[in-house]
């Protein structure tokens, strides 16, 4: 997604202004990389008059990082909470807690965009669930993982 970190009267906030939905089952990785580098990134730069400071990709998606390198994009591994501990909370649950807190505290906003909107995000957030042990179900979660990665970066950059 394209996220803007903004200073507000209440402090820092994360604005999700455009979304590229990754679905490896429907497009080849090379096509995804070409569209990200050739369409999505230029769109975000022009639409929001921005220059990205970094690209973060799911650590499990090495193929996409390699494909993006072909377009001159040096993508970094996103923080997936693999080693996080916060009190008695560990791993992915730390990132989920950060995400819940950001939403509850009014520090995360969706800004609708006609070209790269958030429909997949909105669908997934309604399907996100946990199993009987409180662990997130690993299904319908591409957008939720990406949200968590964005919030991890934001929280660790501005809040801790």
Where on the chain are the PLM-derived regions?
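Mg2+-dependent endonuclease catalytic cores in nucleic-acid-processing enzymes, primarily RNase H-like
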Residues: 10-136, 157-158
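Acidic two-metal-ion nuclease catalytic site recognized across multiple nuclease folds
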Residues: 152-160
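Active-site or metal-binding loop neighborhoods of secreted/extracellular toxin and effector enzymes
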Residues: 149
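Gly/Thr-rich phosphate-binding beta-strand-loop-beta motif of the actin/hexokinase/Hsp70
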Residues: 1-7
